């Protein structure tokens, strides 16, 4: 099971940039992999883990912007296609995590 967090945060002022950076750092510290600059994904073992991490995200939300969460099964994640560019180190590590679970 995967939990995706997708966001679009304002960065027009210094405080907005600081809030956006704090949110991205929170996601990285909580084990999310950056797939794109504002798209992060985390592997979760069960529905309870998804709920736990979603609660953490909600507690860390910045005051402005748009943040969305999407829950995806391992099978759906494996069917994701990279259309342009190369897989990042994070994505390769995520594929290895799938094998371990």
Question: Language-model segments: which ranges?
Answer:
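Basic nucleic-acid-binding interfaces
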Residues: 1-4, 9-101
């Amino acid at each position: 099971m995967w939990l995706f967090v997708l966001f679009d945060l304002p960065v027009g002022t210094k405080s907005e940039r600081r809030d956006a950076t704090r949110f991205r750092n929170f996601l990285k510290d909580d084990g999310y992999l950056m797939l794109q600059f504002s798209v992060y994904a985390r592997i979760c073992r069960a529905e309870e883990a998804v709920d736990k991490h979603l609660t953490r995200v909600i507690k860390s939300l910045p005051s402005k912007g748009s943040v969305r969460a999407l829950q995806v099964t391992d099978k759906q994640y494996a069917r994701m296609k990279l259309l342009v560019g190369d897989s990042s180190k994070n994505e390769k590590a995520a594929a290895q995590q799938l094998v371990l679970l």
